[in-house]
UniProtKB/Swiss-Prot annotation:
HAMAP family hit by this protein: THF_DHG_CYH
Listed GO CC annotations: cytosol
Full protein name: Bifunctional protein FolD
Keyword tags: Amino-acid biosynthesis, Histidine biosynthesis, Hydrolase, Methionine biosynthesis, Multifunctional enzyme, NADP, One-carbon metabolism, Oxidoreductase, Purine biosynthesis
Taxonomy of the source species: Bacteria, Bacillati, Bacillota, Bacilli, Lactobacillales
Amino acid sequence: MGQIIDGKTLAAEIDKQTMTEVQKLKNQGVEPHLVVVLVGENPASQIYVRNKEKRANKLGIKSTLVTMNADISENELLLKIQELNQTEDVNAILVQMPLPKHIDAFKVTMAIDPRKDVDGFHPVNVGKLFEGKTQHTPIACTPQGIMEMFQKYHIDIQGKRAVVVGRSSIVGKPMAALLLNANATVTLAHSYTKNLAALTKEADILVVATGIAHFIKEDQVKEGAVVIDVGMDRDENGKLTGDVDFENVEKHVSYITPVPKGVGPMTISMLMKQTVNLTKWSI
């Protein structure tokens, strides 16, 4: 039976450290300031944004929400980002995805000052991550949260075979880069990968981010592996579940993250920690 990695408790510990750092900055007369830009009225995005605001307020981070209509032009959004880039007391900028179809998300990401890119998606920051130059570099929050989990649970990465299933820019690619930087041998798999089970069964560390409920079954996992489930799916009964068949896989692994209370809580805590880091790096 695998040990459960408790993301909720770990996230609370990180929040506590972040609060201390916020207080230190405030003692120097500096208030960390996160600006979230929300375009349109996507209900899921509104929930995410509300959660970020609530967490920021709880930790003493100033948080501003900029709402824009779904029919604004791409240029109007780019001008708003430019204005935030030039606003001295704004330390961190986050544009909530997805954006309306007529707006190019890559252009928007490119427009954010890399020094204020709290999501770690700007090509400059992604390039630094792949070069292994991560000092003073914002990194995608979910993969960064997973690395914190490895550290906290003393999970050794060096020399291990790691398989990441899912190649998004938000999780898969930065996760692969972080594992590579930590001296793992990394395979990045995706929906076109042939004989996926042959790869996953070899993995000492398996990170799954496909968005497909119970995508990974017990016969696809190596005995004693570390399994990280990034999925947030709904099963046929509407119950929140992950990309891994937790109940059956848990019996075979050394460590596993549950859904909920696994990777999810870490992401928002890392976002707050990164807001504080961007503030410190700007002083």
